[in-house]
């Protein structure tokens, strides 16, 4: 059942965002939890940060206790109070095989009792960082991240406080990982369309009712994306053999010139650039 568990084929529309990382986490949990890592083979250490020899030596023979996610980061908790961060960068993917079949751009291979778990990264922007369990959340990669969008902490009252004195556009605010962790270009466009809010709206001009719509849309869009295996991943098969693409449910992202699914014949989706990133919206129904 787990042969070629991750059938990504390394095709991305964009950097993996929270739903793609969460989908990866859930799949890895099926394979790795309570398993001992018998071998760590660093095939190519050339990632964003070079994989140290220390990483291989310390991770080897440790058991995987749990795998968490913070924003777009995976956090592996191991036995003997060790932990490490994994970030997928632009094109990082894991695959699982019963027999290791080398592929171009393989970087790290983890050997457990029945399977090989391989990290592959074409563009080499991903990385792995070893730390202690006690210190992992104080890592410079994690300690400045904002709140988790799917947590109970994200409520309308808190969101209003966050945007109250911000003079930037709402799209840029949502993209800022220091405020809310894990949102990226695809989901920010989808969230704002769902909420009926223009990406150009200035934060401190957004009403309490509009803020509530954004918060509800954040949770709704992300949960639906996770349920459908994410957007950026192509040909993804989860541990139950289900294949699904959230790209089938995109309302605005990458739909420039197409008819708005809310307004029907009366308006088309526009594309504009905000902070060097493509942004998609309907000028008629997003105010």
Language model region names:
Residues 36-55, 60, 68, 73, ...:
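Basic, nucleic-acid-binding surfaces and adjacent catalytic neighborhoods in DNA/RNA-processing proteins
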Residues 5, 12-14, 84-182, 187-194, ...:
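Phosphate/anion-contacting hairpin/loop surfaces
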Residues 7-12, 230, 234:
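Intrinsically disordered, low-complexity repeat segments enriched in small/polar residues
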Residues 19, 23-26, 157, 161, ...:
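Short, contiguous clusters of charged residues that form electrostatic/catalytic patches at enzyme active sites
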Residues 16, 20, 151, 210:
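Catalytic cores of large soluble enzymes that bind and process phosphate-bearing ligands
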Residues 14-120, 125-128, 262, 277-287:
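A cross-family signal for N-terminal binding/gating loops and helix N-caps
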Residues 9-16, 216:
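Extreme N-terminus of proteins, especially the signal/transit-peptide cleavage junction
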């Amino acid at each position: 059942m787990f042969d070629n568990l991750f059938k990504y084929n390394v095709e991305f529309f964009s950097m993996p965002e929270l739903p793609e990382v969460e989908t990866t986490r859930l799949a890895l949990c099926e394979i790795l939890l309570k398993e001992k890592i018998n071998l760590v083979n660093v095939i190519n250490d050339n990632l964003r940060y070079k994989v140290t020899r220390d990483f291989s030596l310390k991770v080897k023979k440790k058991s995987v206790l749990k795998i968490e996610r913070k924003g777009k980061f995976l956090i592996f908790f191991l036995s003997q109070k060790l932990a490490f961060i994994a970030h997928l960068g632009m094109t990082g993917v894991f695959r699982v095989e019963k027999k290791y079949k080398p592929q171009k751009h393989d970087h790290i291979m983890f050997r457990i009792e029945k399977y090989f778990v391989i990290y592959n990264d074409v563009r080499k922007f991903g990385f792995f960082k070893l730390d202690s369990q006690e210190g992992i959340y104080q890592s410079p990669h994690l300690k400045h991240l904002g709140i988790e969008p799917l947590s109970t902490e994200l409520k309308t009252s808190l969101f209003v406080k966050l945007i109250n004195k911000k003079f930037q556009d709402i799209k840029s605010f949502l993209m800022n990982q220091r405020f809310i962790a894990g949102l990226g270009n695809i989901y920010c466009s989808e969230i704002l369309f769902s909420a009926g809010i223009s990406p150009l709206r200035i934060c401190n001009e957004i009403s309490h009712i509009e803020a509530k719509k954004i918060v509800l849309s954040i949770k709704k869009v992300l949960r639906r994306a996770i349920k459908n295996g994410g957007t950026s991943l192509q040909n993804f098969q989860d541990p139950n053999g289900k294949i699904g693409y959230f790209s089938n449910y995109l309302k605005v992202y990458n739909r420039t010139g197409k008819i708005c699914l809310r307004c029907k014949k009366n308006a088309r989706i526009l594309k504009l650039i905000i902070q060097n990133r493509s942004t998609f919206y309907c000028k008629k129904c997003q105010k």
